[in-house]
Amino acid sequence: HAPGGGSYYAALWTNDQCEYANPFFPFSGYKAGIDQCINCYSAYENYMDRSDKPMREKRPLVSSVIAEGRSFWNGAGDRGDCEMYAYGLTRFLLEMSDIALIKRFWDDIIWCLDFALSRKNNYGVIESDSDELENRFESGNANLFTSCLTYDVLGNAATLAKVMGDAEHAKLWADERAKLRSSIEEYFGGNVEGFKTYKYYDGNRDLRAWICMPLTVEIFDR
């Protein structure tokens, strides 16, 4: 799932490792892979803007950690990277079911969801500069993928919050999840090429493969 395979990674990505590959490793029992996951999620912590700025003004999470962790790449702007990171991290933690690990990354989950929710537009969906296709195809100011990732993270994180005994965040995230589901339907739902489905972004008139994303997060309304 990355150049170098099981020997090394030439770079870490919020999509390739954080979102896609890492949630698999707890099922594998492959210790090197699980250790890699922890190291990978840890490497991104250096790039979470912990300044005193309002969350809306904070820097997005970088897309890639490169050069053995000494530098980064964010040439496509905010691709929904913190949402990708948190999607993979919360699933990884649920699968590991390790209280110490949940505590270890708890502040990162809070940061990511605070950031994501600060990017809600007036229609209640999550804005980002692009998606992992990095503007190879148009994605508008808010795309279906980023909002669906956020929806999934909110549910996963609410479950983890209950494990942590954090009733405040459990309720907040469950409530935000319900609101986001409604917003996804209202903003993205539509008729595309004769199908009652989803527009990938506002104004999208073509069927796109990623309009299946709601199905992957158990939204079966269309």
Ranges and model annotations:
Residues 1, 9, 13, 54-57, ...:
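Catalytic cores of carbohydrate-active enzymes
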Residues 10-123, 144-147, 151:
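Aromatic-rich carbohydrate-recognition surfaces in CAZymes
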Residues 18, 133-136:
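Intrinsically disordered, low-complexity regions of eukaryotic proteins
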